[in-house]
């Protein structure tokens, strides 16, 4: 009986340690994503159609040619693109 309880405790400890490792790995992934800077200011270029805006706004999730002007927003840039030094 004691061996069965001991096995269950060991199994529970292993599962708990694996879940902690999984959480730590997930948090590490979030820290890599936070290395990107989100640009909230819209950028504008002249355009004739939406494809021009996609070419001029790399990394932007919203691109639209509106009355001949590209509207680019929700843009993500690597910190190195913005002139910020990275010490990784």
Curated annotation (Swiss-Prot):
GO terms for biological process: defense response to fungus; killing of cells of another organism. Disulfide bonds join 47-65, 53-70, 57-72. Keywords: Antimicrobial, Disulfide bond, Fungicide, Plant defense, Secreted, Signal. The keyword Secreted applies. It comes from the Eukaryota. It is found in: Secreted. Residues 1-26 form the signal peptide. The keyword Secreted applies. One of its GO terms (cellular component) is extracellular region. Belongs to the DEFL family. This is Putative defensin-like protein 264. It comes from Arabidopsis thaliana.
